[in-house]
A protein has these predicted regions:
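Membrane-proximal helix-turn-helix segments that form the acceptor-binding/catalytic region
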Residues: 104-123
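Acidic donor-binding loop of glycosyltransferase active sites
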Residues: 236-249
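A charged, aromatic-enriched C-terminal amphipathic alpha-helix characteristic of glycosyltransferases
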Residues: 297-334
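N-terminal pre-catalytic "stem/leader" segment of glycosyltransferase-like enzymes
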Residues: 1-85, 282-283, 321
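Conserved catalytic-core segment of nucleotide-activated headgroup transferases in glycan assembly
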Residues: 23-29, 151-153, 158-212, 222
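Short hydrophobic beta-strand element within catalytic cores of glycosyltransferases
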Residues: 261-267
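Donor nucleotide-sugar binding/catalytic pocket of nucleotide-sugar-dependent glycosyltransferases
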Residues: 122-157
Length: 335
């Protein structure tokens, strides 16, 4: 029997790198030294719960979202401990892009272990709609709940006046993750004749690749990785975010753009499909995304329409209040 002593949802990444972090008082203030309340941390933050790497502490919560990571061995051990404490255990993939999951489960032993864990879990929670068929093949209790964003909290509103927004922010960073289509989106951006900003995470090799595009000297700004608040401040100074990502991920870049109140064109992640129905890349060609980008750059009325739609749709479907409502419907002990 579980004698829960801690409130909210515990999100457990057993043995992971992120340190234990309490969200007892909600999302808090933007900070350069702690993990922001986004992605899987957001599930904890919107319920005033906590994110853990320690199974023993997570077991003090009534409901736990266990992240399936690596070869699943640590996740399996954590699952057994949590169930022995009487916790309600939901499971989700730590890296939930479709290609990431396919790679993780490519070995027969891992796939069998996944089936054992997921079929025994109280709930399979997917941050993307694309993994629902996989979960549904082993469990009758599956649900897609997109990762929420602290849109209703003033400290997390990074919006700037429209007349202070210039150019395009490239949402992807990695050349070597082929589903990101980073090379293709930069090639398209090269033709726009507007300021372009890109974050380089690949050091000198990335710089060589970026310089090979031969952008005009005053068009391309290359920035190293930044702390999250500085990254949002940089993004917010642009008219839009552009990406050709086809990784079927939860959609953190699109969520980041929501905090900046600027539209994202492209990307087929969960957040893109919800927040930007007229702009996402699910089922649209790269040519169509290029045309939408040009429309947003040059048609002020269309741009204003997308901003208005962003505010309405995002708050209705992706706010912390909506996240709490959705999670409470499926997991006990959150309210």
């Amino acid at each position: 029997m579980n004698f829960a002593t801690l409130s909210g949802l515990a999100v457990l990444n057993p043995g992971g790198r992120d340190t234990d972090q309490s969200f007892e008082h909600g999302p808090g203030q933007p900070c350069e030294t702690s993990h922001p309340p986004v992605n899987y941390h957001a599930y904890a933050a919107c319920t005033n719960g906590a994110f853990y790497r320690s199974t023993a502490i997570a077991a003090q919560h009534r409901s736990v979202l266990l992240l399936l990571r690596g070869d699943l061995s640590e996740s399996q051990r954590a699952f057994e401990v949590l169930k022995s404490h009487g916790c309600f255990v939901a499971v989700s993939f730590k890296e939930s892009g479709t290609q990431q999951v396919a790679g993780q489960l490519s070995r027969g032993k891992r796939f069998q272990l996944f089936r054992e864990i997921a079929s025994s879990a109280d709930l399979c929670l997917s941050s993307t709609p694309d993994l629902i068929p996989l979960f549904a093949s082993v469990s009758k209790r599956t649900v897609h709940i997109p990762t929420p964003y602290p849109l209703e909290f003033t400290p997390w509103n990074y919006s700037r006046p429209s007349d202070e927004r210039r150019g395009i922010f490239i949402g992807t960073r990695e050349f070597d993750v082929l589903s990101r289509n980073h090379l293709l989106v930069l090639s398209a951006a090269r033709t726009f004749s507007v300021p372009i900003t890109v974050i380089n995470v690949e050091g000198n090799a990335g710089l060589r690749r970026l310089h090979a595009f031969k952008f005009p000297e005053d068009q391309l700004t290359i920035t190293p990785p930044l702390p999250y608040p500085k990254y949002l401040k940089l993004m917010a100074g642009h008219r839009l975010v552009l990406q050709f990502d086809q990784s079927s991920v939860p959609g953190q870049v699109a969520g980041d753009s929501l905090l900046c109140r600027i539209p994202t064109v492209g990307g087929n992640g969960a957040v893109e499909r919800i927040a930007y129905p007229a702009l996402h890349g699910h089922g649209r060609t790269f040519d169509q995304l290029t045309e939408l980008t040009l429309d947003l750059m040059h048609d002020d009325e269309f741009y204003k329409e997308q901003l208005a739609a962003l505010e309405t749709t995002a708050v209705e479907h992706l706010s912390f209040a909506k996240g709490l409502e959705s999670l409470s419907r499926w997991l006990p002990g959150l309210t």
